Curated annotation (Swiss-Prot):
The lineage of its organism: Bacteria, Pseudomonadati, Pseudomonadota, Betaproteobacteria, Burkholderiales. PANTHER family: IDURONATE 2-SULFATASE. Hydrolytic enzyme with a broad substrate specificity acting on phosphate diesters and phosphonate monoesters. Hydrolyzes phosphate mono- and triesters, sulfate monoesters and sulfonate monoesters. Hydrolyzes glyphosate monoesters. Does not hydrolyze DNA or cGMP. Hydrolyzes glyceryl glyphosate, but this substrate has a much lower affinity than the glyphosate monoesters. Its EC number is 3.1.4.-, 3.1.-.-, 3.1.3.-, 3.1.6.-. One of its GO terms (molecular function) is metal ion binding. It comes from Trinickia caryophylli. Anions including Cl(-) and CH3COO(-), and SO4(2-) salts stimulate activity 20-40% at 100 mM. It is an enzyme of class 3 (hydrolase). The gene is pehA. Belongs to the alkaline phosphatase superfamily. Mn(2+) binds at D12, C57, D324, H325. This is Multifunctional alkaline phosphatase superfamily protein PehA.
Length: 514
């Protein structure tokens, strides 16, 4: 069998509605430029209704790379270990003869049963998932990146992260139109791109699998010149939110927790104060900076795409572009990837098949989830989808179209124990194991079920931005019950099935897959 190339591009915190190709399809003039992603969309298939199955980064990447829902892999938060028993994409690729290279990060904490409690990997946010070979890691503690910056002659400040302060500033109150202290030649996006080109050139045309990760448009929200001034605040869309933070907080106890505790310093290096009190001008400026960071990534991808063109590998490479999760960007008075709103969970997905362009430039409306990426790659390479995998291959969408038995709802989860702020379990008075929610969403309704808090129910046709909770409305009681039953059925049908197809028999071990 002819060996094939795979380029899996995973950006960080890029939400789905910041994709110009989708804006044009909706008749809207794009407010940012991504010519290289536009090319990928023209030559590939763009999935409009794609979600990460969980947030934040560590859990989201665990789902992406294991094909498992959060309820099954249970790496429920950043720094929570991933059970060693779960097969991941890296290990599965090795089993079919690939040496999966990784640039970026997976934010994986190792299983403590496989090592010592003194393992240095337990002192950092995350490490590289087993099975992948790092050829340009960000982790641990961004040491690879900062070392590269220093090696190239840039003098790092005493606090290395001060490179993300605005030029000439020692502190910043929030959103800024000033450039980062770090020039674009030494930005983290450039670092990852240089590592990618070095790796690809070293392959000398041999087949490859490359996970190419980027840190942006993740905070801190400050961009290197000229990207800091590429977009004007007044050209950015206004935030979608209630009249004031108190009105937003009244919707649900979890919403109130985040409104009360979200801090600017998590998004603007050196800033202080509440993130929920950003005014509209600050939010528009934040979005302009966010777009600048996106365009910088797009320029970097252009360099990678150009190399594949020049070496004749573009038409031989499956390219998948996606993000780990989205970003609230001031919508609902929130920042980050939290809660239950669409802005945190809806993410880009673009797939360009190698030489197969039957649906080039089209937009797929079917419901896809991040857990579908792993089986898609394995099937494309001739491998098998692990039985435990919750996702399904998306390859049929690239050929004959959506299968008749495809899912009719989106599913996603959030475990909000001790996330980023002041321990939600304390402010909402829950045990850690009760700090979870799951969402069932279709084209008409969205149901949010909490382990130990009141549910939420939204009519997406009448209320697409999720302001009016109908869970307590008697007129919707039957629908709320139906969607609660759907949530229960979904969880039952996706319980761990790693070994459930095996049987002992007089003939020995047998299997039954259907």
């Amino acid at each position: 069998m002819t060996r094939k190339n795979v380029l899996l591009i995973v950006v960080d915190q890029w939400r789905a509605d910041f994709i110009p190709h989708l804006m044009r399809a909706e008749g809207r003039e794009p407010f940012l430029k991504t010519p290289n992603l536009d090319r990928l969309c023209r030559e590939g298939l763009t999935f409009r209704n794609h979600v990460t199955t969980c947030v934040p980064c560590g859990p989201a990447r665990a789902s992406l790379l294991t094909g498992l829902y959060l309820m099954n892999h249970r790496a429920v938060q950043n720094t929570v270990p991933l059970d060693q028993r779960h097969l991941n994409l890296g290990k599965a690729l090795r089993a079919i003869g690939y040496d999966p290279a990784l640039i970026g990060y997976t934010t994986t904490t190792p299983d403590p049963r496989t090592t010592s409690a003194r393992d240095p990997r337990f002192t950092v946010l995350g490490d590289i998932m087993d099975g992948f070979r790092s050829v340009g890691a960000f982790e641990p503690n961004m040491e690879g990146y900062f070392g590269w910056v220093a090696q190239n002659g840039f003098e790092l400040p005493e606090n290395r992260e001060d490179i993300w302060l605005p030029e000439g500033e020692h502190s910043v109150p929030g959103a800024t139109d000033k450039p980062s202290r770090i020039p674009k030649e030494f930005s983290d996006s450039t670092f990852f791109t240089e590592r990618a080109l070095t790796y690809l050139k070293g392959r000398d045309g041999k087949p490859f699998f490359l996970h190419l990760g980027y840190y942006r448009p993740h905070p801190p929200f400050v961009a290197s010149a000229p990207y800091h001034a590429m977009y004007k605040a007044e050209d950015m869309p206004a935030p979608i939110r209630a009249e004031n933070p108190d009105a937003e907080a009244a919707q649900h106890p979890l919403m109130k927790h985040y409104i009360d505790h979200i801090r600017r310093g998590s998004f603007f290096h050196g800033a202080e104060g509440s993130g929920a009190t950003l005014d509209e001008g600050e939010i528009r400026q934040m979005r302009a900076t966010y777009c600048g960071l996106i365009t910088e990534i797009d320029d970097c991808l252009g360099r990678v795409f150009a190399y594949l063109d020049e070496t004749g590998q573009w038409d031989d490479t499956l390219i998948i572009f996606t993000s780990d999760h989205g970003e609230q960007l001031g919508d609902h008075h929130l920042l980050g990837k939290i809660g239950y709103n669409a802005e945190s969970f809806r993410i880009p997905l673009v797939i360009k098949d190698a030489g197969q362009n039957r649906h080039a430039g089209q937009i797929e409306e079917g419901f896809s989830e991040s857990i579908d990426v792993m089986p898609t790659i394995l099937e494309w390479l001739g491998g098998e989808t692990p039985r435990a995998c919750d996702g399904r291959s998306l390859l049929p969408f690239l050929a004959e179209g959506k299968p008749s038995d495809w899912r009719t709802e989106l599913h996603y989860e959030f475990d909000f124990r001790d996330v980023f702020y002041d321990q939600p379990q304390n402010s909402v008075q829950l045990s850690q194991d009760d700090c979870s929610l799951c969402v069932i969403e279709d084209e008409n309704y969205k149901y949010v079920h909490f382990a130990a808090l009141p549910p939420l129910f939204f009519d997406l046709k009448a209320d697409p931005h999720e302001f009016s909770n109908l869970a307590g409305d008697p007129a919707y009681a039957a629908l709320v019950r139906d969607y609660a039953q759907k949530a229960l059925s979904w969880r039952l049908s996706h319980a761990d099935r790693t070994l459930t197809h095996y049987r002992s028999s007089p003939q020995g071990l047998t299997t039954r897959n259907h």
